Amino acid sequence: MCIRDSLTNVFFVVADNIDTKGLIRLGNERVVEARLNDAQFFWDKNKTKNLVKGISDLKNVNYFEGLGTYFDKTQRLRKLGSLISDELLISKEKVELSASICKVDLLSELVGEFPELQGVMGGYFASAQGFDKDLVMAISEQYLPTGSGSRVPKKPFSITLSLADKIDTLVGFFGLNQKPTSSKDPYALRRLALGCLLYTSPSPRDRTRARMPSSA
């Protein structure tokens, strides 16, 4: 748990019965401790696995039928990111590198055990391996915003990777006619489209705006 961006060892559990003997608390403490021990084990094991060397391993992980592997997706992200970087006047090389390694954390046991940490752990792995802070943040924030009220990336490199990822997903799924309907949106395409609009629409906030590249 975090309080004001600082870690604390406090956690909350909701129980239906009064825990007079502390057994419910003890049981949940053991569960949390076991999960944290798992996380520590996987972190120690995964953090030194070279992200750049892991790029080719993405060829063995399918993304979606008709859209290739995660390696194929990262190559599309490189091209899209390069186009967007021209609009934002930022380093194309750094954008292409972040796009190449941004999905490698999906290969880790840590993300396999805690899938909700995808992207976040990629950022931590990149930081542990000495990548610069712009690239680390871009990888960490690639899936943002995640919904209404979610934090929105503001740094140019983060915007570039996040926007490229959303554009690729939208174009790919619509190209396969996997469109949302009035009752179903299994791939959260509406959320992704709204996320793109947050980057490209005028806003009173001090946020870098990305202009959609014409070839996108």
Would you name each region that the model predicts?
Residues R4-S201, R205:
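Amphipathic alpha-helical "coupling" segments that flank catalytic cores
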Residues M1-I3, S203-D206, A210-A216:
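Positively charged, low-complexity/disordered segments
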